């Protein structure tokens, strides 16, 4: 009986050389490649499929864009997903990709699961958090063989595997509908200024056109319309990436704390994510109480950490989502924003659940008798006065 292994396949250098390695070094008879479409460019998906069919024994391409948006990105928006300023496009996609690889492995009778992640990054942990929910063996050639990028490039050439990187320009790109990450090579030097050529989604802010006003509509905490036109999540995010990217919105160059404790220099593009997260957070301020906002900020931070680590099967992750889902019942309305040369500015917001009262807050309003605040003011900071009087004095 053939000894099969299912490989999470992207079409890139790492996963491509895993195919011969799994046979030559690990003794598998059949390598089944699984490419999961979470919004990569169509040409990348097609090229990965074409390459896999030439060098693997069996290949599957799965289009899960709708599932990715509805079950992963929308919960991220509702949770104001953010890890140290990173919108977690790669992080949130990995568990879904891993689950699809497991499904194919079980369908095809594979005895092992493999990925092309290194031993220094986060993705190995995200994939394996899902893979190890099964009883199948888990193989990580890059980590286990301690391979370098230069060695991989030469190995690929020896095996006739085309690669899209060179030793002169060895950065790697990971892309889905929510974000595009660029890392490796000279970019690993935090003192190196990235060349403009690494950016594909965003216009350089100084070259961006004049300002554009847009309106995002929300229901139950998720975006449902753009400029008054209802549309599905995939279409909305794709359009927003183009619009915001044209205005130079959504570039991040950051030092990121990886799960293992290493600090890494990361470059990201995420136009739609920047706009939609800013709009959602602003709308929440209009409809949620101060107590809800304060507590939800803590919940959001914990949610984001679990998502970044790839721990979406943790019971706590479900618990946090239950609370977040309840708060989002009132997060509905519209947010008007201005996009201008790399910046996003909220101009206006409306909601049928707004807790804002223009009459009550106005300096000219008479609904509240200002004298009623006198008693409250007398005892505001009361404990501090007692401390200063009886403790500091002595």
UniProtKB/Swiss-Prot annotation:
Lineage: Archaea, Methanobacteriati, Methanobacteriota, Stenosarchaea group, Methanomicrobia
Pathways per UniProt: Amino-acid biosynthesis; L-arginine biosynthesis; L-arginine from L-ornithine and carbamoyl phosphate: step 2/3
Name the record gives this protein: Argininosuccinate synthase
List of residues binding L-citrulline: 86, 91, 122, 126, 172, 181, 256, 268
InterPro entries associated with the record: Arginosuc_syn_C, Arginosuc_syn_N, Arginosuc_synth, Arginosuc_synth_CS, Arginosuc_synth_type_1_subfam, AS_cat/multimer_dom_body, Rossmann-like_a/b/a_fold
Biological process annotations from GO: argininosuccinate metabolic process; L-arginine biosynthetic process; urea cycle
GO cellular component: cytoplasm
Binding site for L-aspartate: 118, 122-123
Subunit details: Homotetramer.
Organism of this sequence: Methanococcoides burtonii (strain DSM 6242 / NBRC 107633 / OCM 468 / ACE-M)
Binding site for ATP: 8-16, 116
Oxidoreductase keyword on record: no
Tree of life domain: Archaea
Catalytic reaction equation(s): L-citrulline + L-aspartate + ATP = 2-(N(omega)-L-arginino)succinate + AMP + diphosphate + H(+)
Uppermost EC category: ligase
The enzyme's E.C. designation: 6.3.4.5
Keywords per UniProt: Amino-acid biosynthesis, Arginine biosynthesis, ATP-binding, Cytoplasm, Ligase, Nucleotide-binding
Record-linked PANTHER family: ARGININOSUCCINATE SYNTHASE (PTHR11587:SF2)
SUPFAM superfamilies xrefs: Adenine nucleotide alpha hydrolases-like, Argininosuccinate synthetase, C-terminal domain
Localization: Cytoplasm
Principal localisation: cytoplasm
Family indicated by similarity: Belongs to the argininosuccinate synthase family. Type 1 subfamily.
Pfam family, one: Arginosuc_syn_C
GO molecular function: argininosuccinate synthase activity; ATP binding
């Amino acid at each position: 009986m053939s000894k099969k292994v299912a490989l999470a396949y992207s079409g890139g250098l790492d996963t491509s050389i895993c195919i011969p390695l799994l046979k030559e070094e690990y003794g598998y008879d059949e390598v089944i490649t699984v490419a999961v479409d979470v919004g990569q460019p169509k040409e990348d998906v097609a090229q990965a499929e074409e390459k896999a069919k030439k060098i693997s024994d069996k290949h599957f391409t799965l289009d899960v864009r709708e599932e990715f948006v509805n079950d992963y990105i929308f919960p991220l928006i509702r949770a104001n997903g953010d890890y140290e300023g990173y919108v977690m496009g790669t992080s949130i996609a990995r568990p879904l990709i891993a689950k699809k690889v497991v499904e194919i492995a079980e369908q095809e009778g594979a005895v092992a699961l493999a990925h092309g992640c290194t031993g220094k990054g986060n993705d190995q942990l995200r994939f394996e958090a899902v893979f190890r929910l099964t009883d199948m063996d888990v193989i990580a050639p890059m980590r286990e063989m301690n391979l370098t990028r230069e060695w991989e490039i030469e190995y690929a050439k020896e095996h006739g595997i085309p690669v899209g990187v060179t030793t002169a320009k060895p950065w790697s790109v990971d892309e889905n509908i929510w974000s595009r990450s660029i890392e490796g090579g000279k970019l690993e030097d935090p003192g190196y200024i990235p060349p403009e050529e690494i950016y594909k989604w965003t216009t350089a802010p100084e070259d961006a056109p004049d300002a554009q006003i847009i309106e995002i509509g929300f229901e139950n905490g998720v975006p449902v319309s753009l400029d008054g036109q209802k549309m599905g999540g995939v279409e909305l995010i794709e359009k927003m990436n183009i619009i915001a990217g044209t205005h130079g919105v959504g570039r991040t160059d950051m030092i990121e704390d990886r799960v293992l404790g290493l600090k890494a220099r990361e470059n990201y593009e995420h136009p739609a994510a920047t706009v939609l997260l800013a709009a959602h957070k602003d709308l929440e301020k209009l409809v949620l109480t101060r107590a809800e906002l304060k507590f939800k900020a803590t919940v959001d931070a914990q949610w984001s950490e679990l998502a970044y680590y790839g721990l979406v099967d943790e019971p706590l992750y479900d618990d946090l989502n239950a609370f977040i889902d309840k708060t989002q019942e009132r997060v509905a309305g519209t947010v008007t924003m201005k996009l201008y040369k790399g910046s996003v500015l909220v101009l206006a917001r409306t909601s049928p659940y707004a807790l804002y009262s223009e009459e009550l807050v106005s300096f000219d309003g008479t609904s509240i008798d200002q004298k009623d605040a006198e008693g409250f003011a007398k005892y505001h900071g009361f404990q501090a006065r007692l401390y200063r009087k009886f403790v500091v004095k002595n």
